[in-house]
Amino acid sequence: LKKTAKRSLDTREIYAIWNNLDKMQVTPVITLGLKFMLCTLTRGVEVRKAEWSEIDLEGKVWVIPNHKAKNGRRHLVPLNRFALDILQEVKKLTGGLQYVFGWNRIKNIDHSRKVSKNHDLKDTAFNHAMRVNFDQIGIDQKFTPHDLRRTGATLLTSIGYSRDWVSKLLNHTPSGVTASHYDTFDYFEEKRAGIECIQYILDRILSVQSI
C-alpha cells in the first residue's frame, strides 16, 4: 500500500476534522486522543501511553517521564484550555483507571462495573480509526495522526514562533554537546507560550460558523 505523504493541514481541514472526528464509529477515547495530539503537539505513542498519574490538572502540565519519551528525556507538556477540556471529558470514561486514553471493554460496555485498570490503545489504533472512517472526516486529502502534530508546529512557525522553541515543544533531540545539556532548564514558560498560541489559533479557526 502506498504511504500517505507527510503534510500539514490547512485551516479549512482543521475546522472540518475537529468538527467531524466525533462522527467516526470508534470509542470516544480515540477521537479525544486525536484532538489532544493537535492541542499538545505530542506523539501518538505518548498520547496512547499517557497515565493519569502523569497529569496535573491544577498545575496544567503533563509530565512525560524519560522512559516514555522518544529521546529518553523527560518532557513537560503545558496544557492549554482545549487540552484541559479534553481531559475533563475523557476523565468521565477513564478517570480512576491507569491510562488516560486507554480502553477497557468491560467498563466501556457496562459503566457500573468496578475495574481498576485499563489497557493502552494498540499501536495502530489512531491510524486504523482514521483510515476506516476517513469518509466521515470531511476533507479530500488523506493524512496521518502524526500530521496533527506536524500541523501544530507549522501553525506556530507561520505566526513567527521560533523554530528553536517549536523544536523544544516537540521534544526533539538537541544537536551538539552543548545543546544536549539544556534540559537542566526546561524552558517551560517558553513552551507554555507556544501551547497558548495553539489555543489562540484554534480559537480563531473553530469560532467561525463554517469555512
Where are the model-predicted features located?
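Basic, Lys/Arg- and aromatic-enriched nucleic-acid-binding interface segment
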Residues: 1-50, 58, 69-73, 93-94, ...
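Short, contiguous acidic/charged loop-to-helix segments that flank catalytic cores in large enzymes
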Residues: 5-6, 22-25, 66-76, 103-108, ...
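Active-site/catalytic core of tyrosine-dependent DNA strand-transfer enzymes
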Residues: 8-15, 59, 80-140, 173
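C-terminal catalytic core of tyrosine-transesterase DNA break-rejoin enzymes
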Residues: 35-46, 132, 147-173
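Hydrophobic, well-ordered secondary-structure elements that form the walls
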Residues: 79, 130, 153-156, 166, ...
